[in-house]
């Protein structure tokens, strides 16, 4: 196992440990964590944010090292998207109901709507299924720019939710609008829309690969 693949694999292990840790914290009765000053940022969520940023960077790092050192392997190609989806989708699910998965974050006002999570996770399931079908026919479905943009926007939106709309809430300290009209909320909506568009593009661009065996 080369270095880029080790980095990818370590991201999977770290994500699993994070999920288990957050679950354990969620079942500790009476646990509450302070905020960072007057920022409304929960300290546990801040730690998760730091981990998420580092993990997101390793997603870029392992691919860069693999291409630079000519260490691209089939195992790396398989593990990289698995690591990405495990990291992003687990955080999407965790943040869709912070009062359920993180009852210690009593002041958390930012979250990801359930319908957004359903769209983004369903999109990944559909695209992965299509890729599997195409691979069985010897067809490789390449990532498109919308797919890459989708991942970046998801990571930005997740980061904004973890920081509880910081620093955007300083723009409207006495915001008369509901939370679903905040800057963070629109980042989530944009990521959801891009995810849906990229999924449609994958299906349309590669539809011939799925129709060939019917001829």
Q: What name fits each language-model region?
A:
Residues 1-215:
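Alpha-helical transmembrane bundles and membrane-interface segments of multipass inner-membrane proteins
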């Amino acid at each position: 196992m080369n270095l880029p693949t080790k980095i990818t694999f370590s991201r999977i292990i770290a994500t699993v440990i994070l999920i288990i840790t957050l679950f354990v914290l969620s079942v500790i009765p009476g646990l509450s964590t302070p905020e960072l000053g007057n920022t409304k940022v929960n300290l546990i969520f801040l730690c998760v944010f730091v981990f998420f940023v580092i993990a997101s960077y390793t997603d870029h790092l392992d691919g860069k090292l693999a291409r630079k050192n000519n260490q691209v392997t089939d195992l790396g190609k398989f593990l990289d998207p698995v690591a990405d989806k495990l990291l992003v989708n687990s955080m999407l699910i965790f943040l869709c109901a912070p009062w359920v998965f993180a009852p210690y974050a009593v002041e958390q006002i930012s979250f990801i709507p359930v319908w957004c999570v359903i769209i983004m996770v369903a999109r990944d399931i559909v695209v992965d299924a299509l890729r599997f079908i195409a691979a069985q026919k010897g067809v490789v479905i390449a990532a498109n720019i919308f797919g890459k943009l989708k991942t970046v926007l998801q990571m930005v939106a997740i980061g904004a939710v973890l920081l509880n709309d910081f620093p955007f809430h300083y723009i409207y300290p006495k915001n008369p609008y509901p939370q679903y009209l905040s800057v963070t909320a629109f980042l989530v909506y944009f990521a959801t829309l891009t995810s849906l568009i990229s999924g449609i593009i994958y299906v349309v661009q590669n539809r011939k690969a799925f129709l060939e065996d019917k001829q």
